[in-house]
Amino acid sequence: MVRWMFIFLALALVSAVLGFSGIAGAAAAVAQVIFYLFLLSLIVSIVFVILGKKNVNR
């Protein structure tokens, strides 16, 4: 589960770089949406780990 947290964090950071720096140009809006989706996934993963639901791998 912690592995997924780091994966979501990495994907959120990559999406942030693409979306907020202007590198993506026309796709900046899409990158921002993806950033928020992965950020939400990261937060949900953290909540599950804190609550002790470690069997969420399925």
From Swiss-Prot:
Keywords: Cell membrane, Membrane, Transmembrane, Transmembrane helix
Keyword Membrane: yes
Organism: Vibrio parahaemolyticus serotype O3:K6 (strain RIMD 2210633)
Membrane topology field: Multi-pass membrane protein
Protein name: UPF0391 membrane protein VP0082
Entry's localization field: Cell membrane
InterPro entries documented for this protein: DUF1328 (IPR009760)
Predominant location category: membrane
